């Protein structure tokens, strides 16, 4: 539930956005005191490199591509237009994204053996990034 009382089904948003070509894995997070959701995305390596090349940033490493603000902004733009295409409500569309260069594997403890998200461990692992997306320190 967001601060204006809208209930967001994180699983629904994730399953629809996971079909966006640039997304390999996604975890959507909603702070009940905020008006929008945010997202952590493990991008598809090839698609991100293609995007970086279009932006003349193809020489960057994958890790640097994931951290580059222009690339991140472009991914968010792609996600937003895709979200509208799959008919997500305005409040279900992530208002910010952090690109994660590390794959989420059962060994990392961030997903189960069946590759289902483990929300708590993901939120703890990316605590700093989640706060930054909401503009908190």
Regions from the language model: what does each represent?
Residues 1-91, 103-107:
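AMP-binding/adenylate-forming catalytic core of the ANL superfamily
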Residues 62-69, 126-137:
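Acidic/polar alpha-helix N-cap and adjacent early helical turns
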């Amino acid at each position: 539930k967001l601060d204006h009382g809208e209930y967001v089904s994180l699983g629904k948003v994730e399953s629809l956005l996971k079909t966006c070509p640039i997304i390999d894995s996604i975890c959507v997070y909603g702070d009940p005191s905020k008006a929008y959701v945010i997202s952590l995305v493990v991008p598809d390596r090839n698609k991100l490199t293609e995007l970086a090349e279009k932006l003349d940033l193809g020489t960057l490493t994958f890790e640097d591509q994931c951290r580059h603000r222009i690339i991140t902004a472009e991914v968010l733009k792609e996600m937003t237009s895709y979200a509208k295409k799959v008919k997500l409500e305005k409040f279900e569309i992530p208002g910010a994204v952090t690109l994660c260069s590390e794959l989420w594997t059962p060994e990392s403890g961030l997903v189960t053996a069946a590759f289902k998200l483990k929300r708590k461990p993901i939120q703890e692992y990316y605590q700093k990034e989640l706060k930054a997306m909401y503009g908190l320190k």
